[in-house]
Amino acid sequence: KLKGLRWWVVGLVAIAAVINYIDRQAFGALWPDIAKELFPEMDEDGHKAIYGTISTIFILSYAGGQALFGKIFDWIGTRIGFAISIGVWSIATMLHAFAQGLLSFSIFRSLLGIAEAGNWPGAAKANAEWFPTKERALAQGIFNSGAAAGGIVAYPVIGLLSIYFDWKVIFIVVGILGLLWLLPWMFIVKS
């Protein structure tokens, strides 16, 4: 058994939150390039309207995904719950590379929103399972720090990647981060 396992668990959950925010913010950071390539006939107002529609679909899906994944985590536990949530959101992120317009982006963003929503009920459940009451606020604080760190690093990471790669490759690269996260999660967390 790994010494300090609960701290490994909360650390991995915090890293998942970092990845969550990078995947989520990639669309906004890359939108100018996406809009120019996929919607060259539209003006800036048209690009804003499409971006707004796709972003609204993401948020609506995310809101619905909170309750859905809360139930999933209660039903199957944190180990498999996180594997499903992060596995699906990573694949959904990579699928963005194959989007061709409003419909496909809306579908992939919706899938991303539903699956990314699992990170928060999963973190709450992991804290309750792995930490005594007197340490849960600290554990939640560590997880929340991951979310803040993800918001901080997302745009610089995406910006750096955009120097070397086009938007399609970047969605693949950032999607792979979540799949790589699954390796230590499935190895370390056994219940």
Placement of each model-derived feature along the sequence:
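Helix-breaking motifs and short loop linkers at transmembrane-helix boundaries and internal kinks
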Residues: 39, 77, 98-104, 132, ...
